[in-house]
Regions:
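Flexible loop/turn connectors
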Residues: 168, 242-350
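Short acidic capping loops at alpha-helix termini that bridge into adjacent secondary structure
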Residues: 189-190, 222-224, 274-280
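Hinge/beta->alpha junction and helix N-cap segments in small-molecule ligand-binding domains
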Residues: 78-88, 107-115, 168-178, 194-240, ...
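Short beta-strand segments enriched in small/hydrophobic residues
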Residues: 21, 26-30, 66-81, 182, ...
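N-terminal helix-turn-helix DNA-binding module of bacterial transcription factors
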Residues: 1-71
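Flexible loop/hinge segments that line or gate small-molecule binding clefts
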Residues: 111, 134-181, 198, 259, ...
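Amphipathic helical "hinge" segments at domain boundaries
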Residues: 5, 42, 46, 55-130, ...
Length: 350
């Protein structure tokens, strides 16, 4: 009786099974699977091909890759997959992977530091050829241990001063300064930076610092404040919004990312506040819904797809053996002006 193709309840066929079915040696089967057809006769190739079809054999690409030292797999860890920023960056990485012939494995750490560590260990054990990371705030020594082990690594949207690896992201200082200058030009005197806890996350601290520098340079009569909020604490957000709305100065809220912008916009609507009549509103990222909310919300658009694509290009260059000092590619942000930052004169006239 001839063997039948493997089913889910049977052991998957192996190279040994193929060799036995084709009545050839395992070396010949390995050569066939590796594309070394010149070393096999046409009759031998046909027998192996027929045996593979009969048994339903599928080669273990992971095992073959490990044996050759190449898995063609890239690991990626994102801080928050529910953030549109992360999704668009991931699309850029994936598009570049397809062009370069790599497969992408994505892990979502869900803003949990311990989960981030576990995923990095998991991907390393899977023998990925390189890692793209958008870290929550993992200590540099943890990332250094990966880099020092010889695994190529690219960091997105974070700056690690003492880590010798490539980094790709937004020019946060340029983008925050551009946004703050716009708010001041529109007549806003008090700029309130609403952000998730800054901690050791360089992108958040750089945005805050740039905002404060621009406001300080504007001179007396202008002020800047920072409100750090846990996304899950809706009561704290509502309280912060009430205090901001009571300001005697013409005020604007500068939301630190897309998720914060959404929460702030919803919170203002619940309080019956209008933008820009009662308060100005501007946010990092430019989500699709921003153009539809009220008079439209002004935002800083990031080239997120390009950031992801560039990160993978850097990584593949390292995988291919390029040797150079650590590189940093910072993309400029683009100001998208809408009604939420309308000048006081324009608001009064309407």
């Amino acid at each position: 009786m001839r063997p039948t193709p493997s089913t889910d309840t049977q052991r998957p066929p192996t190279i040994t099974d193929v060799a036995r079915e084709a009545k050839v040696g395992k070396t010949s089967v390995s050569r066939y699977l590796n594309g070394e057809f010149d070393s096999l006769s046409e009759a031998l190739r046909l027998r192996i091909q027929q045996a593979i079809g009969t048994l339903g054999f599928r080669p273990n690409q992971m095992a073959r890759g490990l044996k050759r030292g190449r898995t063609r797999m890239i690991g990626m860890v994102v801080a928050d997959i529910s953030n549109p920023y992360s999704v668009e960056v991931m699309r850029g990485v994936e598009a570049a992977c397809q062009k370069q012939g790599f497969m992408l494995m994505v892990c979502n750490s869900d803003n949990q530091l311990e989960l981030e560590r576990r995923y990095l260990d998991l991907l390393t054990n899977y023998r990925v050829e390189g890692l793209v990371i958008n870290p929550i705030g993992l200590p540099e020594e943890d990332l250094a241990s990966i880099s020092n082990a010889g695994l190529p690594l690219v960091i997105i949207d974070r700056r690690a001063v003492h880590l010798q690896c490539d980094m790709v992201g937004l020019d946060n200082r340029q983008a925050a300064a551009l946004a703050t200058q716009h708010l001041l030009q529109q007549g806003f005197q008090a700029i309130h930076f609403f952000t998730e806890p800054i901690g050791q996350i360089s992108s958040r601290s750089e945005r805050e610092q740039a905002l404060r520098q621009v406001v300080a340079a504007a001179g007396k009569g202008y002020s800047a404040s920072t409100v750090e909020l846990d996304m899950a604490d809706s009561a704290a957000l509502a309280d912060a919004l009430r205090k901001t709305l009571k300001s005697k100065k013409r005020s604007a809220i500068f939301a630190g990312n897309g998720r914060m912008l959404l929460n702030v916009a919803l919170g203002l609507q619940q309080l019956g506040a209008r933008w820009p009549e009662d308060i100005g509103l501007l946010g990092f990222d430019d989500p699709n819904w921003a153009a539809l909310a009220g008079s439209g919300i002004t935002g800083i658009r990031q080239p997120t797809f390009d950031i992801g694509h560039a990160a993978l290009d850097f990584l593949v260059q390292r995988i291919d053996g390029i040797v150079s000092p650590a590189r940093m590619q910072a993309f400029p942000g683009e100001l998208i002006v809408r009604g939420s930052t309308g000048a006081l004169k324009n608001v009064t006239e309407t």
